[in-house]
Design a protein with these regions (language model features):
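Short, well-ordered alpha-helical segments in soluble proteins
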Residues: 37-40, 44, 103, 107
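Conserved Switch II/interswitch segment of TRAFAC-class P-loop GTPases
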Residues: 11-34, 41-48, 59-64, 85
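C-terminal-of-GTPase-core extension/linker across diverse P-loop GTPases
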Residues: 88-90, 101-152
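Switch II (G3) loop of P-loop NTPases
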Residues: 1-5
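Low-complexity, flexible helical/coil segments
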Residues: 26-32, 49-56, 87-93, 115-123
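A short linear boundary/processing microfeature
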Residues: 35, 39-42, 72-76
Length: 152
């Protein structure tokens, strides 16, 4: 798995770190996050250089971290944190749009996408939201997180 993760990270424009909300998975989440950092470092990349969102999934299960605990973790970090239950479809599209927002803004800063493609980040996100059936909700989707800053 480690070699596959490194290969995927090598060409990644952004990363969604999916953490398990169950308290019993706290150590595994921490180990996976440290592994992500180490893999990026091996590739000559830094956590600061790669747009990142964190999603706490499995919010529907028992014995999960409380919203207050996740909110506190989010306040301590720079990355936006999304709460989700993938099996119920909650928080998934929001996590995606949070990541899409950060990725677009980073790529725009590096490659001047706004000029080359004649579309700014807000219009790009609005079109993406509309194409997925979320007309007029791009900003709401991007901002459905705790912690972090939009587009950073």
């Amino acid at each position: 798995h480690a070699s596959t993760r490194r290969l995927v990270l090598q060409g990644a424009d952004a990363v969604a770190f999916i953490a398990d909300s169950q308290v019993s998975e706290t150590e595994n989440n921490a180990a996976s996050f440290l592994d992500l950092r180490a893999n990026l470092k091996e590739l000559g990349r830094s956590m600061r250089d790669v747009p990142l969102v964190i999603q706490f999934n499995k919010r529907d299960l028992a014995n999960t971290r409380s919203d207050a605990e996740i909110d506190e973790l989010a306040r301590r970090g720079k990355e936006p944190v999304f709460k989700a239950s993938a099996v119920h479809g909650q928080g998934v599209i929001e996590s995606f749009f949070g990541l899409l927002d950060r990725a677009w803004r980073k790529l725009d800063a590096e490659h001047d996408l706004r000029q080359k493609l004649a579309i700014g980040p807000d219009d790009f996100l609005a079109k993406a939201a509309a194409s997925l059936g979320y007309e007029g909700r791009a900003r709401e989707l991007c901002e459905a997180h705790v912690g972090g800053r939009r587009g950073q």
